[in-house]
Regions:
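Well-ordered, non-membrane alpha-helical segments in soluble/globular domains
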Residues: 35-38, 67-73, 114-127, 158-183, ...
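Short loop/turn segments at strand-loop or loop-helix junctions that form parts
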Residues: 16-22, 90-94, 99-101, 139-142, ...
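A short, Lys/Arg-enriched amphipathic alpha-helix followed by its capping loop at the start of a domain
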Residues: 6-17, 36-49, 252-255
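Mg2+-dependent phosphoryl-transfer enzymes with acidic/Ser/Thr/Gly-rich catalytic loops
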Residues: 6-12, 209-211, 216-305
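Asp-based phosphoryl-transfer active-site loop
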Residues: 9-31, 53-55, 88, 219
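A short acidic (Asp/Glu
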Residues: 62-66, 99-100, 147-150, 246-252, ...
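Conserved acidic, metal-coordinating active-site core of Asp-based
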Residues: 130-237, 244, 248
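Active-site phosphate-binding/coordination module
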Residues: 35-139
């Protein structure tokens, strides 16, 4: 996809903060399975809509499964246009990188939120010894620890083993390493009386992460980056499939922006907020994400030239 040259005197009054698993990447294939998602993202970027991916995924996953398909669809030309901005915040704010016409830039990491190599090695060994049939250790994470469902395993089989894994990893990290950790109704303080980490289950993985990490932190970092590059739109949309994704909109609302959140998995319970919460009818996950992007593409996205 290429775009005709355009002089930019003003930018669209819209910015997007997007979770990836669910609204962009299919939770089944873990890739962008709907082609229009790719082309609509490229068109919106070309129109000058600032777009940030705020995800628990690693930079490697976003580079391979999101940025590379976008580049193949013309993202480089889109990001050379006046006002175009794209950014990635990974591991819920533990790492981040610019995305420009050359692809993803150098990844920066906040080492202060890492569990450390020894703890990661222990979790890796636990998975290999007891849980390798149903899940795998994500080698691409730089700060948090993630263990993900094997793609060929049925969800019901994974869920039963996921609970057993979480109990086991809690015992390893608190007992062997003295890590201050929260897990559902259980908690163990470290030697300083603190609990700086938590076990956070998702529908396809278990994340072990700093309590400082979440989608509001990622949103704040993306806004800071975009503000360095130009004026910010007043109107924003955030899109996600989990309850924690509302925190992106919470951050924007607290900062005084006009925001609405698009919940692509409302069956988990729509949260009450002081801003609008939108659903895409009966559509869920990436089908809902595709419908959302198609709507805004029709409003702002330029046609290929």
């Amino acid at each position: 996809m290429t775009f005709a040259p355009m002089s930019r005197t003003h930018l669209p009054n819209l910015g997007l903060l997007l979770d990836v698993d669910g609204p962009i990447a299919s939770p089944v294939t873990r890739t962008i399975a709907i082609p229009s998602i790719v082309t609509d993202l490229v068109a919106l970027a070309a129109a000058g809509v600032p777009i940030a991916f705020i995800t628990g995924r690693s930079d490697a996953f976003i580079r391979e499964q999101v940025v590379e398909p976008l580049l193949a669809a013309g993202l480089a030309d889109a990001l050379r246009r006046p006002g175009a901005r794209m950014y990635g915040v990974f591991e819920k704010g533990a790492s981040w990188a610019t995305i420009d016409a050359h692809g993803m830039g150098a990844v920066e990491v906040d080492a202060s939120v890492s569990l450390g190599a020894a703890a990661a090695d222990a979790v890796r060994q636990l998975v290999a010894a007891e849980f390798g049939n149903t899940m795998f250790f994500d080698e691409t994470k730089r700060a948090m620890i993630s263990v993900e469902q094997n793609p060929h395993i049925a969800t019901a089989d994974y869920v039963s083993e996921q609970a057993r894994f979480q109990d086991a990893v809690y015992e390893v990290l608190t007992g062997d390493f003295g890590i201050g950790l929260r897990y559902r109704d259980r908690s163990m303080a470290d030697g300083n009386g603190a609990m700086p980490f938590r076990i956070d289950p998702t529908i396809i993985s278990t994340d072990i992460e700093s309590v400082l990490l979440d989608k509001d932190r990622g949103a704040a970092r993306a806004l800071e980056q975009f503000a360095q590059l130009g004026p910010l739109p007043q109107r924003w949309r955030t899109v996600g499939d989990s309850r924690s994704d509302y925190k992106m909109a919470d951050q924007l609302h607290a900062d005084g922006f006009e925001v609405a959140h698009v919940d692509v998995r409302p069956s988990d319970g729509i949260l009450e907020r002081d801003y609008p919460v939108i659903t895409e009818g009966d559509l869920v996950n990436d089908e809902a994400g595709a419908a959302f992007l198609a709507y805004w593409r029709a409003q702002f996205g330029p046609e290929p030239g």
